[in-house]
């Protein structure tokens, strides 16, 4: 009887632990956007675009010579 009680308690513990791991919302899966922080920096994008444009113009000038 004692072994059966311990076994049933162990099984209950395993089921509860599995449920807690399976339904933990803090990790795994896709997370909903909680903060609407923009990761886009328009000034940096404009600076990169301008640098690429300048290098392209310089490359074209070198090809003409």
Curated annotation (Swiss-Prot):
The keyword Ribonucleoprotein does not apply. The modification Pyrrolidone carboxylic acid is found at residue 20. The modification Glycine amide is found at residue 28. One of its GO terms (biological process) is neuropeptide signaling pathway. Keywords: Amidation, Cleavage on pair of basic residues, Flight, Hormone, Neuropeptide, Pyrrolidone carboxylic acid, Secreted, Signal. Residues 1-19 form the signal peptide. It is found in: Secreted. GO terms for cellular component: extracellular region. GO terms for molecular function: hormone activity. It holds the Pfam family Adipokin_hormo. Coiled coil: none annotated. Belongs to the AKH/HRTH/RPCH family. This hormone, released from cells in the corpora cardiaca, causes release of diglycerides from the fat body and stimulation of muscles to use these diglycerides as an energy source during energy-demanding processes. This is Adipokinetic prohormone.
